[in-house]
């Protein structure tokens, strides 16, 4: 725990050192706000852990770790806009404090800041780290696109769902570990192994996150419960429910999924009850 705290403190210190232009404040204030919301800093911690696991000095991986954390928060900022989420980590989301256009543009700025930090990785690992980061970033966009497309489909399979969350969530945890391993001097085989471990960790994380969106405590979860239900997100629970429910339950679930107008709290309660059966 002492080592993790040292890593965490180092990450927070570097995040606090990010330099922003004085103007326009309307671009950079939302970035500072998003990063100030905190979080567990799981991805940068994994990067530093993986670096030291292969006998590297964790400080050599700090720039990459910070870049990954800024990038992760950029994805959350844009996700909140697309999902129309009002709360993130117990605080109003950027698009609620400002507006959607500001949130989109500030998110774009965060993506550029993230790449700037990734590109500061020291030789001889710069090229490999940048290439892996770009591959991961594009895969996350692919996963988000699948997620949006699945909202309009009723025939999403469990296999399609798993591939979607692999791209949307798991590849970033795998990438965080592999980037740290590369900087730490790991062999290609070892770096690939730790990447696969990170992917598995990411899949488990997303499955748990989907469950918490239905059954979690809002105070501990940090955002409103039921957002996935309101957006008809094809989570494992919804896919599984569609396979299990029959008769009137199946009709009720289909009615809620196709409803254009509804009371949000009523829909959340009704669909949750169907999940429980």
Regions found by a protein language model. Give the residues of each.
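Charged, compositionally biased N-terminal leader segments and the immediate start
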Residues: 1-2, 12
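Mg2+-dependent prenyl diphosphate-binding active-site environment of isoprenoid biosynthetic enzymes
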Residues: 3, 7, 16, 20-250
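Mobile late-domain/C-terminal helix-loop "cap" segments
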Residues: 251-277
